[in-house]
Amino acid sequence: MKDLNTSEITNKIIPKSIADEVAIALSHYPELKDTPIEFRFKEKIKKSFMQAQPKFSGIFKNKKNRSYFVMITEHFHIENESFSISEVPSEVLIGWIGHELGHIMDYQERSGINLIGFGISYLTSHKFIKEAERAADTFAVSHGMGDYILATKDFILNHAHLSSIYKDRIRKLYLSPEEILLLVEELKD
């Protein structure tokens, strides 16, 4: 039986409260049309608002038969600040979702053993985190989501209530607005 609080697009389970934003982000990734993805609200995600990951039960399945989660916190807590997903502008949310879909694009090309190694490296290596986050941003920008990714970066880096520690972490790990603009220009050529 279908949950009345979710919406469905082919092979997707999406909370209704973010269905429009997810649909827009997915429209930039036609190659994910048949990929099973469940967008799910989660109480807490360490150091993040969203997190894409393969379902563990499918890690060793054929790459084409894997399914994924995109975990999303409804209430973001960063140090002493807290705000709700409903306070996030739509284009920012689309950018965040697009970034997470970029991770799924990356995961699809990896073997099961490689995914396990990816997870371990992500947990233990700052350099690896930076590479993975920049790859996800690059996937999103190369899929026509540059404006959304820029809106997300602008929201984070210019949000008065977010700490400088958190903003510095974002600056270190993700593409900068300047790098995003440069990538957009390169893709136009």
Question: What function would you assign to each model-found segment?
Answer:
Residues 1-64:
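A metal-dependent hydrolase signature that marks the N-terminal structural subdomain at the beginning
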Residues 88-105:
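Short alpha-helix carrying the canonical HExxH Zn2+-binding catalytic motif
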Residues 91, 106-134:
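Post-HEXXH active-site segment of zinc metalloproteases
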